[in-house]
C-alpha cells in the first residue's frame, strides 16, 4: 500500500537451498516474495531440457521446487509475514493450479498472512 508501506520486504529467488541466514531474515519480513520454480515430476518429464540442465535446476545452485518452498514456509512457527507472493514458476515445469492447491494448506493452519501465486504467463496474482 502506497500510504502505509510495509516495514520490510524479502525477495528470494534463484536458490537451490536456503541458508540459515536467509531463513532468519525472511522470518522478519512483512512481505515475502519467494520462488517455487518447478514440480519435480514435471521437470523429470520435460523433454526440452537436457539431463545436465535438470541436474543444475535441482542442485544447490539451481531453484527451489514446490515441495522445498512449501516445506520452508511450513517450518516456521512464527513470522512477521502479512503477504507471501509465490513466483518465478517455470512455464514448462510447473502449474499455477498445482502450486495454489499445495500452498492452500498454509492458509488452513490459522496463519494470519495472505498467500498469492503469480502466474508466469499473465503476471496475475492468484489468491490461495
Question: Model regions: which residues?
Answer:
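Core dinuclear metal-dependent hydrolase active-site scaffold
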Residues: 1-31, 126-128
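Cap/insert and terminal regions of metallo-dependent hydrolase folds
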Residues: 19-118
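Long, positively charged, glycine-interspersed low-complexity recognition regions
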Residues: 110, 119-128
Amino acid at each position: 500500500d502506497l500510504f502505509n508501506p510495509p516495514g520490510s520486504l524479502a525477495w528470494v529467488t534463484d536458490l537451490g537451498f536456503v541458508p540459515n541466514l536467509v531463513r532468519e531474515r525472511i522470518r522478519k519480513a512483512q512481505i515475502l516474495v519467494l520462488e517455487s520454480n518447478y514440480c519435480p515430476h514435471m521437470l523429470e518429464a520435460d523433454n526440452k531440457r537436457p539431463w545436465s540442465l535438470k541436474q543444475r535446476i535441482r542442485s544447490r545452485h539451481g531453484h527451489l521446487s514446490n515441495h522445498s518452498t512449501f516445506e520452508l514456509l511450513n517450518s516456521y512457527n512464527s513470522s512477521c509475514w502479512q503477504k507471501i507472493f509465490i513466483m518465478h514458476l517455470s512455464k514448462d515445469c510447473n502449474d499455477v493450479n498445482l502450486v495454489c492447491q499445495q500452498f492452500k494448506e498454509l492458509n488452513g493452519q490459522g496463519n494470519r498472512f495472505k498467500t498469492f501465486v503469480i502466474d508466469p504467463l499473465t503476471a496475475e496474482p492468484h489468491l490461495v
